[in-house]
Amino acid sequence: MADTVALKVSGLDVHYKDFQALWDVSIEVNAGQVVSIIGANGAGKSTLLNTTSGLSTPTKGTIEFLGDRIDGQPPHETVARGVSLVPEGRRVFPRLTVYENLFIGSYTPKSRPKREQILGTIYELFPVLKERRNQMSDTLSGGEQQMLAIGRALMSEPKLILCDEISLGLAPVIIAGIYKRLRQINEDGITIVLVEQDITRSLKAANYAYILLEGKVVLEGEPSVMTEEQVKKAYFGM
């Protein structure tokens, strides 16, 4: 039986005024996979996620989620279809409590009636969020804020989450804990696209990987068959 394609990006170009950020990018993500998008700063990784989530508009190409076109849709419609973004830099609402930040994530018609049930699941995954639920989010540590950003994305009951640089600025022990939770999330049936600069960790977590360089896909494949030399050449453009 063929794998179900959750996300299909075909021939994507994205411009910011006169600057072209993505050039004919195509990727496929099967349902249930963890797919890693790797590249240095400026490679176009965040642009790819932002365009998939509806925050940016492509100038060419298509994006399909479970067979339906989602390119050019506003972000709230993309979320309602089952795609959630964990943005770079966490972007929690600083003067709202942990609970209020999570509450905001459950605004879709599907998730609203089950808000308390979903909250319980998030609290099981990240017990510290339950402990600090009445605390202002700007008083949390960086790792706790990242847990909150992931929890908020999960409140809409997504089928796919797009994680943008979730290890940025965090201590290795905290990163290890967050990646452990990501494995649990994936084992619960949620497909994950993971954007990272950390080559080793992201390849270890993924079933499949794409490497971007200057807005183009320069290498793709299963991490287990990618050689260190291939990855270095693709990442650094050697």
Give a label for each model feature:
Residues 136-140, 144:
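Conserved ABC ATPase signature
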